[in-house]
UniProtKB/Swiss-Prot annotation:
One Pfam family in the UniProt entry: PCRF
Keywords of this entry: Cytoplasm, Methylation, Protein biosynthesis
Major location (coarse): cytoplasm
Name by which UniProt lists this protein: Peptide chain release factor 2
UniProt keyword Lyase, yes or no: no
PROSITE patterns per the UniProt record, alphabetical: RF_PROK_I
GO terms under cellular component: cytoplasm
Coiled-coil portions: none
Residues found modified as N5-methylglutamine: 249
Keyword Oxidoreductase included in the entry's annotation: no
Source organism (scientific name): Kosmotoga olearia (strain ATCC BAA-1733 / DSM 21960 / TBF 19.5.1)
Function text: Peptide chain release factor 2 directs the termination of translation in response to the peptide chain termination codons UGA and UAA.
Family designation: Belongs to the prokaryotic/mitochondrial release factor family.
GO molecular function, one term: translation release factor activity, codon specific
Amino acid sequence: MLSYETNARIQELRDKFENIKTTVDVDKIKEKLSRIEKELSDPSVWSDQRRAGKLGQQAQALRSQLDLLNKVQELFENIDIAVELSEEDESYLENLNELLKEAEDMVKEFELNILLSSPYDAYNAYLSVHPGAGGTESQDWASMLLRMYIRWAERNNYKVTTIEEQPGEEAGIKSATINIAGPYAYGKLKYEAGVHRLVRISPFDANHRRHTSFASVSVFPEMDDDVEIDIRPEDLKIDTYRAGGAGGQHVNRTESAVRITHIPTGIVVTCQNERSQHQNKATAMKILKAKLFELELEKKRQEKMKLMGEQKDIAWGNQIRSYVFQPYTMVKDHRTNYETGDVQAVMDGYIDDFIEKELLFFASIDEDKE
């Protein structure tokens, strides 16, 4: 006979899945998928490779939702069979526990899939990191955050492309922007935007004192070309400069790197990874468009955080998460109150629990879907 704990675990998992299912309109998902597949079957759509790629990405995301739903339902059927067998023969209990663990992981994944249902959640993401005041220490912290997100992206099998990276004078980075490509990259990362605080004994302090450093993270969706954003030429200041890595590595002899300032908002974007000034300008304009679009989304949602190219006042006031290395180890999100003592795992990109808690938190306060 199954223990009370096992029965309660099964019932809790089943109730959670049924509650999530009530938020899913399967017919609507199938209808949308059918419409996209019909469009993709038209040979003319492939004349625009970018649009075809976006449609393919949307179709992949919808199929993923349907496949996951079917897999979880099949898993519960197998659990029911395992329960019957376990009541007759306790040797089947191990198999039942394995199925329950698999079901818990799948229900968690399904829940995230449903939470990521805003129109732009399925898009690729741009992610920028900027250090706060504090020189080398904060610049090193910014590079640690950048590494954390790259590791997270790699663990999710996302493609990471560096758009621009300006190395610090002694260590770390002065700024960096990367593109993270994959299903729901933006939806998963959008609430990572904000100020991240580090407390540690600085390796750059000869007296080994404890330092507090800040760095800001901005996240914005990679927009389709057909999304219209009004950008007036007279509102732009465009500068060019020589691109190159730290220590004079791979220095470009021509001024191919581009910096664009959007004067009305103060947003600044740079790009130096392309081969020509023309390509860098095109990429920078695309990023500017994405930032302006995200800024409008933020205003509509009436959220406190604002995504700006130049992060101002990166300090205590608007921090979202603290990372404490000494005198104890803890990472704590100040919005959800979720925390863990395994700082090293977090810095190695294991931040899915934080992302899940963020999505649940903002869903619980009934954030308006765009």
